[in-house]
Amino acid sequence: MSVEEDATVREPLDLIRLSIEERIYVKLRSDRELRGKLHAFDQHLNMILGDVEEVITTIEIDDETYEEIVRTTKRTVPFLFVRGDGVILVSPPLRTT
């Protein structure tokens, strides 16, 4: 297979395949977001990410004023296994030609 054929996108998972060893953005259920280096994935979108920054957003309602209180929690994880059934969106890095 030539380099040109290897770099083409014919199926949705091809776009993710081209992002191996690059930083990607993953949005998960439960208002979780991940940014990390993609090391491996499969057809179920199970992924192994390295150097991961996880952001968890929680929204609470104040009992007295009924205002929304938005809180974000961040953590850094060296390696993370992401189960594919919780993945909503995968965004590859921006590419400039």
UniProtKB/Swiss-Prot annotation:
<dbReference type="GO" id="GO:1990726">
    <property type="term" value="C:Lsm1-7-Pat1 complex"/>
</dbReference>
<comment type="similarity">
    <text>Belongs to the snRNP Sm proteins family.</text>
</comment>
<keyword id="KW-0687">Ribonucleoprotein</keyword>
<comment type="subunit">
    <text>Component of the heptameric LSM1-LSM7 complex that forms a seven-membered ring structure with a donut shape. The LSM subunits are arranged in the order LSM1, LSM2, LSM3, LSM6, LSM5, LSM7 and LSM4. Component of the heptameric LSM2-LSM8 complex that forms a seven-membered ring structure with a donut shape. The LSM subunits are arranged in the order LSM8, LSM2, LSM3, LSM6, LSM5, LSM7 and LSM4. LSM3A subunit interacts only with its two neighboring subunits, LSM2 and LSM6A or LSM6B.</text>
</comment>
<dbReference type="GO" id="GO:0005681">
    <property type="term" value="C:spliceosomal complex"/>
</dbReference>
<dbReference type="GO" id="GO:0005634">
    <property type="term" value="C:nucleus"/>
</dbReference>
<dbReference type="GO" id="GO:0003723">
    <property type="term" value="F:RNA binding"/>
</dbReference>
<dbReference type="InterPro" id="IPR040002">
    <property type="entry name" value="Sm-like_LSM3"/>
</dbReference>
<dbReference type="Pfam" id="PF01423">
    <property type="entry name" value="LSM"/>
</dbReference>
<keyword id="KW-0508">mRNA splicing</keyword>
<dbReference type="InterPro" id="IPR001163">
    <property type="entry name" value="Sm_dom_euk/arc"/>
</dbReference>
<dbReference type="GO" id="GO:0000932">
    <property type="term" value="C:P-body"/>
</dbReference>
<keyword id="KW-0507">mRNA processing</keyword>
<feature type="modified residue" description="N-acetylserine">
    <location>
        <position position="2"/>
    </location>
</feature>
<keyword id="KW-0694">RNA-binding</keyword>
<feature type="domain" description="Sm">
    <location>
        <begin position="11"/>
        <end position="96"/>
    </location>
</feature>
<protein>
    <recommendedName>
        <fullName>Sm-like protein LSM3A</fullName>
    </recommendedName>
</protein>
<comment type="function">
    <text>Component of LSM protein complexes, which are involved in RNA processing. Component of the cytoplasmic LSM1-LSM7 complex which is involved in mRNA degradation by promoting decapping and leading to accurate 5'-3' mRNA decay. The cytoplasmic LSM1-LSM7 complex regulates developmental gene expression by the decapping of specific development-related transcripts. Component of the nuclear LSM2-LSM8 complex which is involved splicing nuclear mRNAs.</text>
</comment>
<dbReference type="InterPro" id="IPR034105">
    <property type="entry name" value="Lsm3"/>
</dbReference>
<dbReference type="GO" id="GO:0000290">
    <property type="term" value="P:deadenylation-dependent decapping of nuclear-transcribed mRNA"/>
</dbReference>
<dbReference type="GO" id="GO:0000398">
    <property type="term" value="P:mRNA splicing, via spliceosome"/>
</dbReference>
<keyword id="KW-0747">Spliceosome</keyword>
<keyword id="KW-0007">Acetylation</keyword>
<keyword id="KW-0963">Cytoplasm</keyword>
<dbReference type="GO" id="GO:0120115">
    <property type="term" value="C:Lsm2-8 complex"/>
</dbReference>
<keyword id="KW-0539">Nucleus</keyword>
<dbReference type="InterPro" id="IPR047575">
    <property type="entry name" value="Sm"/>
</dbReference>
<dbReference type="InterPro" id="IPR010920">
    <property type="entry name" value="LSM_dom_sf"/>
</dbReference>
